[in-house]
Structures are given as structure tokens and as C-alpha cells.
């Protein structure tokens, strides 16, 4: 019989099981993250707009909660976060959205969720941002530039709040198989990373207190995820 193939990345729970709420719970990264967290004994909850997506979340090990960030108040969102140990912002307007929605979802949605976390007393807050977010052209009406502007402004707002935040800025996303190997840096080259590896980075970040108060870019590389995050411990906090 052939030996059992070990997973590329396995999350080991170093603390008690956590309840983690993921906004944008039906996104590809969010579903992959939910499965990793559930397999490690944590309790993921996914916030979704469409109740028809609930079955997909349950299949990934997450409990679905129908809540639209664009139509909900801070108090309503805070109610959904109450009792959680951590919150992940993984929502996105999508590549086909117009400029206005990039601002209302990618910027305003992230800020509203972060403010709701403060109201709910949830200190740990982790953001799916974007590589090069601070390098946008403020005079451009191009969709990508507006997206980067939205991410940059959201990240700045999160950093200003009284939260134990971590902001992760992945490179170009692919659907490749995971490698478990990354490059983590304050600034990295503009290469790509698989969504599966991004999900694994977020799962590890939620276990890694040394990432609190850190903002970094991550792309595919040659360093195991856990080691890359450990090495991040000496990096300076983002301004």
C-alpha cells in the first residue's frame, strides 16, 4: 500500500478552539480558510449576502450567517460578531464591479466591520488586502487603481483603531495547488500566490500573536509559512 500523502500545510491549534467570523464567507479564500480552521478544531462563521450560499459554507465547515455589509448598521454587524475571538475581512466587490462598489465594499465594508468589532469587544482583526495597495494613482479612474485606493484607505483606517490587527497583502491570486511555501516582506516583488496558500497564511496568522500590529505582502516563495511568520516578528509596525 502506498504511504498516505501528507498535506502541504497543516494548522496545529496552539491555543483553545477559537470562534472566527469571516466576512465574505463565500469567497474562494474564505471557503478554503474555513475548511482549514474547522479541521483544526476552530469554529468558523461566514457572513454572506445570499442565503443560497449557505450549503457551500456548511460543506466547508463554517456556520453561515446572512448579513449584508452594505445594508447593515454597525450595531447589527456588532451583534453578529459578539462572542467571537477573531474577525477576518475577506469580502470583495469582485473584478467586474464598478468604481463606486469598490469603495463601498472594499473600503467602507472593511472599515464598518472593523468598527463593529470594536463595538463588539472583539480585538483580533485580520484583513485580506492587496499587494501594492499604497501605490495607486490618485488621479486615475481605472478600476484597478480605485481598488488599490479603496484597500489602502481601508487598511489605514483599520490601523488607526484600537484592535489587534494584522493586514495581509497577497500578490496576484491563482487557483494553483498549495505549496506551503511563501515569501513574506513589507514590500515584495509583484509575483503571484495560490488562493490555497493565502488561506493557509491566514489560518497561521490567526494562531501567531507575533503578527499583531503587522502589515506585510505575501507571494509564493521558498519559506514554509510558519517560519516566514516567525521571522516577521522583528519587523516594524506599519505607519
Spans of model-derived segments:
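Substrate-positioning beta->alpha
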Residues: 150, 189-204, 214
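Short-chain dehydrogenase/reductase
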Residues: 215-223
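Non-catalytic, hydrophobic alpha-helical segments
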Residues: 29, 87, 168, 198-202, ...
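Conserved beta-strand positions in the Rossmann-like core of class I SAM-dependent methyltransferases
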Residues: 21, 45, 65, 126, ...
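Glycine/proline-rich active-site loop of Rossmann-fold NAD(P)-dependent oxidoreductases
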Residues: 177-180, 205-214
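N-terminal Rossmann NAD(P)H-binding glycine-rich loop of SDR-like oxidoreductase domains
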Residues: 18-42
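NAD(P)H-binding glycine-rich loop region in Rossmannoid oxidoreductase-like domains
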Residues: 46-112, 116-119, 207-210
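Glycine-/Pro-rich loop/turn segments that contact NAD(P) or position catalytic residues
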Residues: 93-185
Amino acid at each position: 500500500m502506498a504511504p498516505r500523502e501528507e498535506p502541504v500545510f497543516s494548522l496545529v491549534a496552539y491555543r483553545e478552539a477559537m470562534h472566527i467570523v469571516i466576512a465574505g464567507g463565500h469567497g474562494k479564500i474564505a471557503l478554503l480558510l474555513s475548511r482549514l480552521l474547522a479541521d483544526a478544531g476552530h469554529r468558523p462563521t461566514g457572513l454572506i449576502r445570499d442565503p443560497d450560499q449557505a450549503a457551500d459554507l456548511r460543506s466547508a465547515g463554517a456556520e453561515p450567517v446572512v448579513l449584508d455589509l452594505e445594508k447593515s448598521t454597525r450595531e447589527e454587524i456588532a451583534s453578529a460578531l459578539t462572542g467571537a475571538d477573531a474577525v477576518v475581512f475577506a469580502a470583495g466587490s469582485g473584478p467586474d464591479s464598478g468604481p463606486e462598489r469598490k469603495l463601498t465594499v472594499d473600503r467602507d465594508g472593511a472599515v464598518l466591520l472593523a468598527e463593529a468589532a470594536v463595538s463588539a469587544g472583539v480585538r483580533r482583526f485580520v484583513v485580506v488586502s492587496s499587494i501594492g495597495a499604497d501605490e495607486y494613482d490618485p488621479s486615475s479612474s481605472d478600476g484597478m487603481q480605485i481598488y488599490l485606493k479603496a484597500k489602502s484607505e481601508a487598511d489605514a483606517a483599520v490601523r488607526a483603531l484600537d484592535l489587534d490587527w494584522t493586514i495581509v497583502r497577497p500578490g496576484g491570486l491563482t487557483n494553483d495547488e498549495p505549496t506551503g511555501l511563501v515569501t513574506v516582506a513589507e514590500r515584495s516583488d509583484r509575483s503571484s500566490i495560490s488562493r490555497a496558500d493565502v488561506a493557509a497564511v491566514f489560518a497561521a496568522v490567526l494562531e501567531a500573536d507575533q503578527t499583531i500590529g503587522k502589515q506585510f505582502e505575501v507571494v509564493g516563495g521558498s519559506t514554509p509559512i510558519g517560519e516566514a511568520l516567525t521571522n516577521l516578528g522583528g519587523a516594524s509596525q506599519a505607519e
